[in-house]
């Protein structure tokens, strides 16, 4: 189980980070905060059995607005739709659970 998160930065309005952690989101924020001049804050996160796949799907969805290192210049509408996008992609990942090749890759 892991979490895909959406973070903001008070110093960079309109820029958001889509990332992943298998641990605690707050600890991840503290780690990212080191060396960052602004204040990073949590907007939302989504728990999933497939955190890295979900993160990749989100990065692909928003690749046209990626600025650097998993940071994206997003509109308020895109930020507001983050949770819904996660849910939609999770449905796709859930449907793949029974696919032989997907199951083989994701054995626990």
Identify the role of each PLM range.
Residues 1-108:
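Non-catalytic accessory segments flanking enzymatic or RNA/DNA-binding domains
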